[in-house]
Amino acid sequence: MLFERARGVFPGGVNSPARALKHLAAPLVANGASGPYLYTDRGRLVDYCMAFGAIILGHAHPRVKNAVAKQLERGWIYALLTEEEVAYAERIKAHVPSIEKMRIVNSGTEATMNAVRLARGYTRRDVIIKFDGNFHGSHDYVLVKAGSGAATWGVPTSAGVPQDVIKLTAVVPYNDVDAFVKAVREVGGRLAAVIVEPIAANYGLIIPDREFIKALREETERAGALLIFDEVVTGFRVGLSGAQGHFGVRPDLTTLGKVVGGGFPIGIFGGRADVMDMVAPSGPVYNAGTYNAHPVSVAAGLAVVEELERGEPYKIANEAAERLARGIEDIAGRVGFDVVVKQIASMFQLYFRRGDVKTPQDVRESDERLYLKLHELAIKHGVYLAPSQYETNFTSAAHTRDVVETTLAALEKAFTELKSQVGK
């Protein structure tokens, strides 16, 4: 069995914890992907994980394949400046006005790590504020639990994170203006930056109030701190200008990833020119990497951005998410479940609960047991949903109306079977 072999060479048998799918007998094994479909050891599945949001055009999109193939013909790494990376950066800058200059790295984790380092270097301050339920990668600066005030700041969420590192990170309730303002006052003149997912997509899907996003901008400006929007998930998915375009708020720094790499490893941190000019070699904040602005990732990313500029991919993907959100709520209600579906652009998530979802606590209070059972049954009926209520579902330009209707029919079977298993 492949999983047994995998456990002999990988911790837990996988190379990222979310792939473990512990509620299943064994993880899914992928054999290929095309359009909206994953091909797995459980058969063909309509994919709504989409590589945790990295794929927006559909798997193995022809334009991306062609761009990558052309790059491979010319070689795949030079560790030198290329015309393609400049053209790519110019396209990013054209759509995200807050990014005046940028550095192209290799992952969202690298992007946020360097953005935090840069903010500290620019402001010459050391404390950052992040939010409960927001995920910014797997580096030490941000692996911090939520607390209830200054006395409880600095509790790590991972073994191996030094106390001296994470005591400089304060965690504040998400979508809570009063708690945020209080935290800014408590930190005072030590505050270097506030880092936030402007739409939280790594703890389910939480769409904050506009007043909250507005307060982030106002309070950081008042405090002389930088505002960092982590748009690794939302960048070029919510639209060409991301969540910052949706809310009409201009951060000082932005991080991007996922969609802008077309499924290849990439990360970007960028923002105000005066801040970015602090990055080496023009300034004292160090960043370097053999694989920075990797030609293959840049080629794939540029192909995706150019395709998105047509507008049609967004129209198809967003309509699919809207139809799924309405359809799932309708099916769940008819079968006899209390379900809330949150949706924006081509992202959606469903929760077994009554009442809205506005905070991470609302997500925690939803019935995770039912979600995991539904996830397993959906696979049985040919649909791969996000593997936890703490993740987000994504649609793509390959999720046509026919695919959506097939999905809803399959989910009706899954909900009905779930009802027969759990009863009233």
From Swiss-Prot:
- Name of the protein described by the UniProt record: Glutamate-1-semialdehyde 2,1-aminomutase
Q: Which Gene3D superfamilies match?
A: Aspartate Aminotransferase, domain 1, Type I PLP-dependent aspartate aminotransferase-like (Major domain)
Obligatory cofactor(s): pyridoxal 5'-phosphate
Give the residue spans that cross the bilayer. none
Q: Where in the cell is it found?
A: Cytoplasm
Q: In which pathway does it act?
A: Porphyrin-containing compound metabolism; protoporphyrin-IX biosynthesis; 5-aminolevulinate from L-glutamyl-tRNA(Glu): step 2/2
| Enzyme Commission numbers on file | 5.4.3.8
N6-(pyridoxal phosphate)lysine PTM sites in chain numbering: 258
Q: Name one GO molecular function term.
A: pyridoxal phosphate binding
GO CC field: cytoplasm
Give the UniProt keywords, A-Z. Answer: Cytoplasm, Isomerase, Porphyrin biosynthesis, Pyridoxal phosphate
Q: HAMAP family, alphabetically?
A: HemL_aminotrans_3 (MF_00375)
The family assignment reads: Belongs to the class-III pyridoxal-phosphate-dependent aminotransferase family. HemL subfamily.
Q: Which Pfam families match?
A: Aminotran_3
Q: Which reaction does it catalyse?
A: (S)-4-amino-5-oxopentanoate = 5-aminolevulinate
Does the keyword Magnesium feature in the UniProt annotation?
no
GO BP annotations listed:
protoporphyrinogen IX biosynthetic process
